[in-house]
Amino acid sequence: MRCRTHLVFSNVVALGLIQPNNVKDLVVCMTAATVGGIVSDLDIRTSDKHKAVDLMVFLFFSLLVLGYYFDIKYNYGLFNMIGNSKYYLNVIGMFVFLGICFYGMHQPHRSFLHSFLGIFLLTGTLYYCFNVIWFPFLLGMLSHIFLDIFNKRPLRLLYPLKYGFSLKLCNYNSPVDTWVFIISIICLGLELYIL
């Protein structure tokens, strides 16, 4: 399935199950479901998402190193302040989440980021550090994997085991993908109208 299909379908699933009752919850739900719906394809070497995450990881670590350097040199106490605040877990969580994504990006496509292990590690990190977004993120990831099971290329759900699973009913750019996308757009529109 294409990225656009995963993006829309993940939101249909998350909004249908969570049914947020205000704009803030709607935005949080849709954002987390969108990230969950496309994070599994970070391992596609040619994708723009792969390049964007490479850049984000590089910038994040560069800023962290620069921040630490200036914190020590000028004695700002920034890292002590973060360590003593409630945001400490959030910073650690971002670190761990990006590290897991970075690891997954460098694995073969449809392996780690399409596995139960990948789902558990990414969702577990969010549950522990950002517990507001873990459930829509999980629904987004599960919806991605659900759609990809119908593809001809197998998913390594039990990664690191080599065995893959696939129903072999469609391929990447098939009419099935187009129909799932169109039906998902209609459902998303209806859900947003009802909410």
Predicted features, each with a name:
Residues 1-195:
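N-terminal membrane-targeting hydrophobic helices
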